[in-house]
């Protein structure tokens, strides 16, 4: 009888039992349900039942390496090791190079059961081939976390990762479909449920059209995707298995300040003058980023315009929340916006996590927010702080700007709304009235419908309609 160091919830025991009888599957429980504990205990069972030598955890998001390291130590008596770990003279941990990771794999028999690396390691052909060979006898189980983040089948890391073929494969994601069924291809391919090429997969499930017939304008045969997922996916959402406090969503609208408004419409005019170039560009949304930045913090774009209605509103929300004994989590898409947020919130002993913060320091910032009473606010980018962290000390979440899709939005919110949450979470989306902010707010909920894998042939707006919609 296996003894667990941390007692799982009943639904987690169900997941562990499912994993005992399936060796190629997708654990797609919603954010905050506790997927990592289930995966760790399945690996522990396999170790103690079959005397397997190693389980490799591959992180689709690099910063998750340290979360997994802490989770293994927290929930088991086994040790974990991040491949390539080396120390500076100061004692600080430094990220390992491919050479150092390969050196570690040469002495794999001396390493602990749980090995951890990031998906980018597989960009190295030597590393990918080494893992492929080790999967024959040493590495009998691979856990691939946030595998949906590996989207491009033509990339070197995808090709390298797909070579790994251990006895037991467990893919994990809280968001099995982000923007389209194409995001599932690598997951299905690795688990052995898809034998066709990416081109064939795309032709079968996508409706092609638009300029030259190369644009995906919709989806078809979605019932086949659903049937496949039913065979190999276990998914429970928080609302079904955990009695958590409610989430309250508040759309907070502000009017742009005079100079801010002038700059905004100057940018709109510039875009409209080059509208054909924008529409024909590979990524028209990128051309509109300046508008989004202007509604957040115009100082990114102009040395003479620093006023921001959204920043003023954010300060107001934080001040009220902190006075009521609450902690706040503030998100933005852009590091420059987070820096200005931090400048305005210095009095709250702010923690921060952006792409500029080293992975090893992110855990310290997370710990600061969770454990220090004096730290009232944590500020970060959606890309760096929106996954893999537990921020349940926060009960107020503020979006200075929203991501392009609803899955990323909910993923970020669920840093606070997960196991351990004891209070209601209030989520503010601050938007400038009559601007691109409102249009994106509408857009992410429209795209969210696609992510539910329910409707056959949902059509996306073509580029012209999309740009005109966002500028309207």
Walk through the language-model features, giving the residues of each:
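SF2 helicase/translocase ATPase core recognition
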Residues: 164-201, 241-268, 376, 380-462
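Conserved P-loop NTPase motor "coupling/switch" region that bridges the ATPase
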Residues: 53-54, 74-80, 86-103, 107-110, ...
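Conserved pre-motif I regulatory segment
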Residues: 1-28
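Conserved motor-coupling elements within RecA-like helicase/translocase cores
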Residues: 92-115, 361-376
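Conserved helicase motor
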Residues: 83-100, 119-124, 149-154, 332-336, ...
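Conserved Helicase C-terminal RecA-like lobe
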Residues: 1, 30, 34, 38-50, ...
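Inter-lobe coupling linker of SF2 helicases/translocases
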Residues: 116-122, 128-138, 151, 156-167, ...
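Conserved Walker A/P-loop ATP-binding site and its immediately adjacent core
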Residues: 52-74, 180-183, 333-334
């Amino acid at each position: 009888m296996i003894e667990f160091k941390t007692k799982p919830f009943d639904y987690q025991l169900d997941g562990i039992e499912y994993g005992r009888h399936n060796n190629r599957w997708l654990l797609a429980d919603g954010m905050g349900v506790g997927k990592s504990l289930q995966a760790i205990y399945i690996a522990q069972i396999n170790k103690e039942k079959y005397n397997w030598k190693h389980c490799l955890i591959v992180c689709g998001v690099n910063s998750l390496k340290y979360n997994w390291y802490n989770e293994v130590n927290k929930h088991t008596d086994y040790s974990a090791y991040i491949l390539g770990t080396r120390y500076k003279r100061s004692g600080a941990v430094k990220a390992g190079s491919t050479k150092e990771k390969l050196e570690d794999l040469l002495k794999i028999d001396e390493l602990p059961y749980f090995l951890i690396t990031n998906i980018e390691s597989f960009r190295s052909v030597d590393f990918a081939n080494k893992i492929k060979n080790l999967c024959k006898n040493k590495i009998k189980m691979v856990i691939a976390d946030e595998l949906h983040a590996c989207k491009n089948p033509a990339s070197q890391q995808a090709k390298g990762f797909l070579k790994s073929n251990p006895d037991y494969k467990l893919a994990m994601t809280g968001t099995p479909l982000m923007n389209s069924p194409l995001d599932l291809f690598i997951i299905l391919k690795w688990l052995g449920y898809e034998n066709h090429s990416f081109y064939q997969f795309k032709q079968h499930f996508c409706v092609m059209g638009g300029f030259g017939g190369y644009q995906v304008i919709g989806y078809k045969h979605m019932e086949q995707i659903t049937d496949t997922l039913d065979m190999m996916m276990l998914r429970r959402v928080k609302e079904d298995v955990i009695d958590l406090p409610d989430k309250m969503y508040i759309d907070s609208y502000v009017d742009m300040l005079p100079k801010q408004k002038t700059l905004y419409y100057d940018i709109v005019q510039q875009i409209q003058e080059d509208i054909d170039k924008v529409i024909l560009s590979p990524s028209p949304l990128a051309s509109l980023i300046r508008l989004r930045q202007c509604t957040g913090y115009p100082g990114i774009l102009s040395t003479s315009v620093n006023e921001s209605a959204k920043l003023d509103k954010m300060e107001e929300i934080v001040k009220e929340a902190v006075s009521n004994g609450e902690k706040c989590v503030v998100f933005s898409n852009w590091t420059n916006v987070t820096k200005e947020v931090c400048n305005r919130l210095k009095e709250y002993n702010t923690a921060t996590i952006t792409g500029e913060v080293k992975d090893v320091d992110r855990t310290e910032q997370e710990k600061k927010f969770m454990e220090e009473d004096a730290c009232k606010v944590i500020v970060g980018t959606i890309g760096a702080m929106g996954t893999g962290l537990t921020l349940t000390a926060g009960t107020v979440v503020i979006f200075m700007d929203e991501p392009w899709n609803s899955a990323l939005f909910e993923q970020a919110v669920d840093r606070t709304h997960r196991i351990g949450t004891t209070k209601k979470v209030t989520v503010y989306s601050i938007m400038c009235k009559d601007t691109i902010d409102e249009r994106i707010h509408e857009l992410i909920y429209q795209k969210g419908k696609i992510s539910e894998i329910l409707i056959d042939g949902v059509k996306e707006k073509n580029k012209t309609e999309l740009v005109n919609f966002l500028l309207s």
